[in-house]
Amino acid sequence: MANDERVATGEDRAWGRLGVAELRIDAASVAPNDPTEDREVVLPIPGPAVSPIPRLTQPPRSSPPRPDAPSDLPRAQREPTKRSPATAGPTEDPNFADKIFKQAAPARKKPRFMPPPKLICGGVTDVTAELPAPSWDRVAEEFGIPDSWKNILAPLVETQRFAKTLQSYNGAKKSGNVLPSQDQIFAWARYCAPHEVKVIIVGQDPYPTEGDAHGLAFSVPVGRRVPPSLRRVFAALKDCYGDGFPTPSSGSLIAWAKQGVLLLNRHLTVERGLPRSHVSMGWDKLTFGVIKTLANDNPRMAVMLWGYDAKTFVPKLPSKHLRLEYSHPSTSTRRPFDCRHFIEANKFLEEGGLQAVVWRLP
């Protein structure tokens, strides 16, 4: 090649790979009178041929003409489009709006009338109808309540609320599984008068074992096996007094009740084998009223609240009384029952001029 031929650069080689090469010619090598004078001429040089990739094409599908497709005929010569009555316009169907609304509106369900609410207590249904308030004389006779508690219990008994409690209790009693027996439900009121109460020990509900519940919280009749929770109470007394509290021969706490210790459960009945089965029967309304009245009337009391249920049951007390809280003595709790409530209660009573309780049992 001539000297004027330029060496192809990397860019030129790149163009060559694409099938086009460039040859740049200097203006001096161009002949005079040539129209390409005084300018750079770029001539394409064929490179390696690159065949284009053929593109596959398919012929357009032919679909049958739609009957409602627009036609090229004049509007006057077109055939009218037939519509179903459901899709006809308002000008074609006079009942168009009614049909559309009937199709769009959902079917209305018939209203369901729920029965009035019911109160279920221990498997017994108590309707919420208004009941006549029972008389104090009838209740005291049926349950064997002494007259010394009339001033406190009569206002709580002669109410429609307690009438519903009695209705629930009478319904549950038909099964024969209610503990304790009816003559022992108010046994806590037989051993001391209201003005003699100086210590209150609050329990949850009676023992659900046949023969254990006899109307006093935590207590069992003579001859019955001492329950585990009561054994832990005796162990706490042993820690407080040492040899001054020998192991009792039974779990009966009647000796405490005769000294003014009110052993009161929050709920007065239970179904056999089902703890806390009568919590919705309404006994707690009556027992709370008893504690509230005693707290207002009595000058000085020590109230022992063991467990969350007892603490929430008696939220407040007048400052003249001593409030003692601790975990429940049940064996299901991990915390040991090592409270010293018995010593603290006696100290509080003696400071007020009252006689201390003899916790020792026969």
Curated annotation (Swiss-Prot):
Can you tell me which residues form the catalytic site? 205
Q: Which GO terms describe its biological process?
A: base-excision repair, AP site formation via deaminated base removal
In residue numbers, the region (Disordered) covers 28-97
Task: Report the top EC class in one word.
Answer: hydrolase
Q: Which SUPFAM superfamilies match?
A: Uracil-DNA glycosylase-like
Quick one: where is this thing mainly located?
host cell
- Localization in the cell: Host nucleus
The EC designation for this entry is 3.2.2.27
- Asked if S-adenosyl-L-methionine is a keyword of the record, the answer is no
Pfam families the UniProt entry points to: UDG (PF03167)
Question: Keywords assigned by UniProt?
Answer: DNA damage, DNA repair, Host nucleus, Hydrolase
Q: Name one GO cellular component term.
A: host cell nucleus
Disulfide linkage = none
Catalytic activity, reaction form: Hydrolyzes single-stranded DNA or mismatched double-stranded DNA and polynucleotides, releasing free uracil
Q: Name one GO molecular function term.
A: uracil DNA N-glycosylase activity
InterPro entries cross-referenced by the UniProt entry: UDG_fam1, Ura-DNA_Glyclase_AS, Uracil-DNA_glycosylase-like, Uracil-DNA_glycosylase-like_sf
What family does the database annotate?
Belongs to the uracil-DNA glycosylase (UDG) superfamily. UNG family.
Q: What does this protein do?
A: Excises uracil residues from the DNA which can arise as a result of misincorporation of dUMP residues by DNA polymerase or deamination of cytosines. Therefore may reduce deleterious uracil incorporation into the viral genome, particularly in terminally differentiated cells which lack DNA repair enzymes.
Q: Mind telling me what this protein is named?
A: Uracil-DNA glycosylase
This protein's gene is called UL2
